[in-house]
């Protein structure tokens, strides 16, 4: 036969303190699912940028790139100032939004703009200094490959390649230099 609870007050107090301690530890050290090395691989691109055509050094746009949702999302807001990416017949210049997220295995970008529609890209860093994303499905019968390279001076070079769908025959389509907007 077991003794009534009142006869084991020390055990009851010990169990209560242990339970409170476990609960306090859980409350003090919450898990941040997006604070991993992989989730920081695109941090070099976060900032306010002036965007220049690498060939002419002409200012062609502005891009605001920021982290959202506890650092889980990298969001891009691009506004072009020139006709560099204007689609024929469209009365206004390119503006668009990119939402980037590391999914545990690779980076995904969902891009939508006022010219070309929507593109979904996927990829990872390559060679230790460049982020490389490729379109998952063709857009207008073309594949797209984007490469962001961080430079020692703090600038970022964005190379854009296109290829006929499924061919892997990449041609340089755009070469942009991102410089901090001061």
Give the role of each language-model region.
Residues 12-21:
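Bacterial N-terminal signal peptides
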Residues 2-11:
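Bacterial N-terminal signal peptides that target proteins for export
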Residues 26-182:
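Hydrophobic small-molecule pocket/channel-lining residues, especially in calycin-type beta-barrels
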């Amino acid at each position: 036969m077991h003794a009534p609870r009142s006869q084991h007050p020390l055990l009851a107090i010990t169990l209560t303190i242990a339970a409170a301690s476990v609960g306090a530890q859980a409350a003090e050290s919450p898990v941040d699912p997006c604070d991993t090395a992989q989730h920081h691989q695109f941090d070099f691109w976060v900032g306010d940028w002036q965007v220049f055509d690498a060939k002419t050094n002409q200012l062609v746009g502005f891009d605001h790139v920021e982290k959202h949702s506890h650092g889980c999302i990298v969001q891009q807001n691009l506004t072009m100032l020139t006709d560099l990416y204007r689609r024929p017949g469209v009365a206004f210049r390119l503006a668009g939004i990119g939402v980037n997220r590391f999914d545990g295995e690779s980076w995904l970008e969902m891009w939508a703009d006022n010219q070309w529609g929507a593109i979904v890209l996927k990829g990872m860093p390559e060679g230790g200094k460049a982020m490389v994303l490729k379109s998952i499905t063709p857009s207008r019968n073309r594949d797209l490959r984007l490469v962001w390279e961080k430079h020692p001076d703090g600038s970022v070079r964005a190379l854009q390649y296109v290829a006929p769908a499924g061919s892997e025959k990449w041609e340089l389509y755009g070469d942009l230099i991102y410089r901090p907007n001061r």
